[in-house]
């Protein structure tokens, strides 16, 4: 879908029905899925096979919605989580571990500021908050040998400060680390954080 316009992606991406399947994405409400044997289920639990076995972990409806978001964002993969805070925690905690350091714009949602400044600190991950108007040199000065990522919000909540994504991305990429962008308050096709 990468060559399609945003309007087409909104309508067509994600669910791709085959002949005889519903035109509209069905909502799968089952929490569990049937298999012929416990060996088949065991292979799924052991991650030897791919498939659905428990909706809390994976569900066809969620997968299609995630694929649509991925197509709209121009990404390579996506997953659904229960909240923005869950997404921020998941993204940062899968990159950082105890003893690591991260950098974040200081103009971010209060819950995220608390997550990085208090909760992650209790887990041994230190965060340095940087003014979003800082120069590339000032951002680079905050980088340490154990810095694993840089974080920012496209439009900060509630201050509505606009993040210079390109500036933060330049620093992150120069140092071989990801820039994680919370794009909650922006429209996908306007800010396009994955372009950076």
Task: Label the predicted regions.
Residues 37-86, 111-119:
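Conserved N-terminal alpha-helix of the aminotransferase class I/II PLP-enzyme fold
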Residues 21, 69, 87, 102, ...:
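Buried hydrophobic positions in well-ordered alpha/beta secondary-structure cores of metabolic enzymes
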Residues 119, 123-130:
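A glycine-rich helix N-cap at a beta->alpha junction
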Residues 188-196:
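Conserved small/polar residues in nucleotide/adenosyl-binding loops
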Residues 1-59, 67:
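N-terminal "arm"/small-domain region of PLP-dependent enzymes with the aminotransferase-like
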Residues 132-187:
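Active-site phosphate-binding strand-loop segment of PLP-dependent enzymes
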Residues 94-112, 131:
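Conserved PLP-anchoring active-site segment centered on the Schiff-base-forming lysine
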């Amino acid at each position: 879908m990468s060559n399609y316009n945003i309007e087409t992606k909104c309508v067509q991406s994600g669910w791709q029905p085959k002949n005889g399947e519903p035109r509209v994405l069905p909502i799968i409400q089952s929490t569990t899925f049937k298999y012929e044997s416990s060996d088949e289920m065991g292979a799924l639990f052991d991650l030897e096979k791919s498939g659905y076995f428990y909706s809390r972990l994976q569900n066809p409806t969620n997968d299609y919605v995630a694929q649509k978001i991925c197509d709209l964002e121009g990404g390579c993969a996506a997953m659904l989580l229960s909240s923005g805070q869950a997404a921020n925690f998941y993204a940062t905690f899968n990159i950082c571990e105890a003893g690591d350091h991260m950098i974040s714009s200081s103009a971010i949602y209060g819950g995220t500021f608390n997550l990085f400044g208090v909760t992650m600190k209790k887990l041994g991950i230190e965060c340095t908050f940087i003014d979003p108007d800082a120069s590339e040199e000032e951002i680079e000065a905050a980088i340490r040998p154990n810095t694993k990522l840089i974080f920012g919000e496209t439009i900060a909540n509630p201050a509505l400060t606009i993040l210079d994504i390109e500036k933060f991305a330049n620093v992150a990429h120069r140092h071989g680390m990801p820039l994680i962008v919370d794009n909650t308050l922006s429209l996908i096709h306007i800010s396009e954080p994955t372009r950076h």
